A protein has these predicted regions:
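N-terminal core-binding DNA-recognition domain of tyrosine recombinases/integrases
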Residues: 1-53, 67-68
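Short, charged phosphate-coordinating catalytic segments
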Residues: 27-37, 84-106
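Long, amphipathic, Lys/Arg-enriched alpha-helical "connector/arm" segment
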Residues: 49-76, 86-89
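Conserved tyrosine-mediated DNA breakage-rejoining catalytic core shared by Y-recombinases
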Residues: 87, 96-132
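Short, polar N-cap/turn motifs at the start of nucleic acid-interacting alpha helices
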Residues: 101-108, 185, 201-224
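Short, basic (Lys/Arg/His-rich) helix/loop patches that form interaction surfaces
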Residues: 137-142, 153-211
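C-terminal secondary-structure termini that scaffold catalytic or DNA-interacting sites
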Residues: 161-163, 238-246
């Protein structure tokens, strides 16, 4: 239970993965008559899950990354990330992109996404089109997710994306405030959040963005929007409510 885990250093989502795997194994054993024990169905045998605080890259930060002079290997990683940041596609779909998905005449990208098996049609951003043309009218080669995440952190540091970000993490059942350099929080999935957040901030309607990201509800979509408390406060300060004369 949660009390016993509080003595350790595991984070809730790590514990959740352990429990989820264990429940799957026990369910298989039960359904295939290896055991009659069905305790895994009990309510207290739950999967732990915590909403993890994540970041996104602003368009200014993406531009800094885009302008870096890099070797061929690093360029492929950077360019794949930029494509994801302006299409909202998951890493798994970026890895599947082929020339047949690209329509340069109408500047559209069309693909059936792997996770949700949904057809999405995405306008081709000028940066995305430039990247495809750079690689001979096709997508850049994609590395393994683990390698990509490692390289991205280094490239974001090189691009000067090093401002400090404070978040709250749970470890050993205790919440702590932890500070990271932003570059160290970047993963391939940051690109998808960056697309959703930047499009939302640009005033594109949520439902239009959801047609691209594949979110079925606005509630699940809003979890992708990563506007910091400082950005929110600055936006609010421009509202007439905060502009009243004393």
């Amino acid at each position: 239970n949660e009390a016993s885990h509080s003595r350790g250093k595991y984070k809730p989502n790590v514990i959740g993965k352990f429990v989820k795997s264990m429940k799957a194994m026990l369910r298989y054993a039960y359904e295939n008559n290896y055991t009659t024990n069905d305790d895994f169905k009990r309510r207290e045998f739950k999967v732990y899950k915590e909403n993890v605080e994540t970041v996104y890259l602003t368009e200014k930060e993406l531009n800094s990354l885009y302008k870096l002079e890099l070797n061929e290997n690093d360029s492929c990683v950077r360019d794949s990330f930029i494509v994801s940041s302006y299409t909202g596609l998951r890493y798994s779909d970026i890895a599947r992109l082929q020339q047949k998905h690209l329509d340069f005449e109408h500047k559209l990208l069309t693909i059936v996404t792997q996770k949700t098996n949904t057809l999405v049609v995405i306008p081709m951003h000028p940066k995305v089109e430039a990247i495809f043309r750079k690689y001979g009218y096709q997508p850049p080669k994609v590395q393994s997710n683990q390698s990509t995440n490692r390289v991205l952190k280094r490239l974001c540091r090189k691009a000067g994306i090093t401002n400090f970000v404070s978040i709250v993490e749970t470890s050993g059942g205790i919440k702590h405030e932890v500070t990271y350099e932003k570059c160290d929080m970047i993963t391939s999935h940051t690109a998808r959040r960056s697309f959703a957040t930047n499009a939302y901030r640009a005033g594109i309607p949520s439902l239009s963005i959801m047609q691209i990201t594949g979110h079925s509800t606005e509630t699940s979509f809003m979890k992708y929007i990563r506007i910091s408390k400082e950005e929110n406060a600055i936006a609010l300060s421009k509202h007439t409510f905060f502009q009243a004369n004393v």
